[in-house]
Amino acid sequence: MKLDYVLLLLFHLCFVNTELISVITGKIKDSGTTIAISAGAFWGLKDRLKCYLYECCHEPDVNFNYHTLDADIANLLFGQHLVKDVVVNSIKSHWYNENPRKPLVLSFHGYTGSGKNYVAEIIANNTFRLGLRSTFVQHIVATNDFPDKNKLEEYQVELRNRILTTVQKCQRSIFIFDEADKLPEQLLGAIKPFLDYYSTISGVDFRRSIFILLSNKGGGEIARITKEQYESGYPREQLRLEAFERELMNFSYNEKGGLQMSELISNHLIDHFVPFLPLQREHVRSCVGAYLRKRGRGDLVSNVDFVERVLNSLQYFPESSKAFSSSGCKRVDAKTDLEMAKIRPLLSSVHFDDEL
């Protein structure tokens, strides 16, 4: 309502103040010209004011930056060379394609703490000024958004409307489906038309949108392949996407739950199955260092004893070598905070008594 009053005031100013109009547009010749220019100035100011108060689907609110996306994934994500290669290049290609045939659909797979949510956040941050807080980013968590299995028909309608409404506002919208392996097959099937090779659906073009599916499914297969590479003495960086993608596709198609028998796979609508490898101790060490710097305690990064205490507080597998972190970097923040609390000087009893 306040916006309506502001717009009305702007129109009044543009219409009656020919001096203002002349400054903006040039010399006024007659009353007809005055009205035309007033209307044009009004709508121009209206659009500017709207985008000042609300998020709009153009710069500066939408401003994909390939270079910072590449740099962020390279500098903030550890031990995931395949992610950098596939994700950065696929998004770059999709963004700069003036006539994509379908939305970009990425399926992230791997154990917890390997960086799936983190990469989705990095993508959002390098596409929208507000990142995950953007109205054009929909972060959908299966167990939170669709908890009742008896309401699947209601959820289908709700999900379709949510997707359609978001893309109506911005064709560059991003949809992140967390815990996609826990989504009922009916709900994944409900979004199939939006991912398919259609120019429009209900008058809306979805081909410039991005859909990201996050799943723990396939984590065991990814860990097996990575473990075999490690035990053979070869660097993990030599692993290629081809070693995982077919396994993940078959696993996702046949495994009970999640993407089982989904038309998304049988119709080849998922563009890339992206494996997130289990993290080794050296990668977790990098996560500890990054968190310490974030907390303003970069001085502790070189404190070997401190960092080792954090690393030793985590669990590793397999039992024979303990080469890989069971929780990736997911528990690093909590464990690092705990160790920092142990070395933080306590308030003396004198200070405590003074405060009382």
From Swiss-Prot:
Residues making up the signal peptide according to the UniProt record: 1-18
Gene designation: ooc-5
Family annotation (Pfam families): TOR1A_C, Torsin
Keyword ATP-binding applies: yes
Family: Belongs to the ClpA/ClpB family. Torsin subfamily.
Sites where a glycan is attached: N125, N250
Main location: endoplasmic reticulum
Keywords carried by this UniProt record: ATP-binding, Endoplasmic reticulum, Glycoprotein, Nucleotide-binding, Signal
A GO MF term: ATP hydrolysis activity
Membrane-spanning segments: none
InterPro entries in UniProt: ClpA/B, P-loop_NTPase, TOR1A_C, Torsin, Torsin_1/2
Residues involved in ATP binding: G110, Y111, T112, G113, S114, G115, K116, N117
Knockout mutant characteristics: Worms show defects in asymmetric divisions in early embryos. In particular, mutations specifically affect the reestablishment of asymmetric PAR protein domains in the P1 cell at the 2-cell stage.
Function statement: May serve as a molecular chaperone assisting in the proper folding of secreted and/or membrane proteins.
Location of this chain's protein in the cell: Endoplasmic reticulum lumen
Source organism, top-level taxon: Eukaryota
Name of the molecule in the record: Torsin-like protein
GO cellular component entries: aster; endoplasmic reticulum; endoplasmic reticulum lumen; perinuclear region of cytoplasm; plasma membrane; spindle; spindle pole
Gene Ontology process terms (BP): cellular response to misfolded protein; chaperone cofactor-dependent protein refolding
